């Protein structure tokens, strides 16, 4: 017999070798990788909640300062109007003139205390009386310093924060994973079993009679 001829262009077979440790880690590490992904998702949710809370605090502070500024301006305007009204001691009747586009009201003032603004100097007696009145008012009313109001006790939460906290709570519940209790299974097993106790002779005869009839 002649020798077998080798086929032209034949190539040797390639052999693939795997690292056993890495292969074992990959095949047995599905749960581990799943827990790592879940942990990373929880950390991301916590980070988003902190950023949203910080943003809400800044917005709340800006609105609060704006409201405080508006109140201070309104108080200043009221004080100015009260001072002007206090200077007028007596008024005459006002007269209104109606025009097609607007109305004009003319009020005549007979007496005006210009010393209240500081345009005219007060007499010594009036100065002493005002100083005494100011001292009495200071004693009756304690000094109040303008300060920012305290923050509210309840946190100011947005819809985004509520949704993030709900998802975080759901993930934590999944992570906990309640195990089924074995006490219920034991109770079911015990309830299925018949309680065996002492029986009388007549009862035993009845039972044996029933068994015999069934056999027949």
Curated annotation (Swiss-Prot):
GO cellular component: nucleolus
Span list, region Disordered: 120-154, 167-216
Biased composition (Basic residues): 171-181
Principal location: nucleus
Coiled-coil features, chain-numbered ranges: 30-83
Pfam (any one): Nop25
Keywords attached to this entry: Coiled coil, Nucleus, RNA-binding, rRNA-binding
One example GO MF annotation: rRNA binding
Role: May bind to rRNA.
Official protein name in the record: Nucleolar protein 12
Source organism of the structure: Xenopus tropicalis (Western clawed frog)
């Amino acid at each position: 017999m002649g020798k077998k001829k080798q086929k032209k262009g034949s190539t040797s077979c390639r052999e693939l070798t795997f690292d056993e440790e890495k292969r074992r880690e990959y095949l047995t590490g599905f749960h581990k990788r799943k827990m790592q992904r879940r942990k990373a998702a929880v950390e991301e949710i916590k980070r988003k909640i902190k950023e949203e809370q910080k943003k809400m605090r800044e917005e709340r502070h800006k609105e609060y300062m704006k409201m405080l500024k508006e109140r201070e301006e309104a108080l200043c305007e009221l004080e100015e109007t009260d001072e002007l009204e206090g200077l007028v001691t007596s008024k005459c009747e006002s007269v209104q003139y109606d025009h097609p586009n607007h109305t004009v009201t003319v009020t005549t003032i007979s007496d005006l205390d210009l010393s209240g603004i500081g345009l005219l100097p007060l007499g010594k007696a009036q100065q002493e009386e005002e100083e005494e009145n100011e001292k009495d008012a200071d004693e009756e009313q304690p000094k109040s310093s303008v300060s920012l109001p305290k923050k509210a006790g309840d946190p100011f939460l947005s819809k985004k924060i509520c949704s993030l906290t709900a998802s975080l709570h759901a993930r934590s519940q999944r992570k906990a994973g309640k195990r089924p209790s074995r006490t219920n299974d034991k109770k079911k097993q015990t309830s299925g079993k018949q309680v065996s106790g002492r029986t009388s002779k007549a009862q035993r005869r009845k039972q044996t009679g029933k068994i015999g009839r069934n056999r027949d």
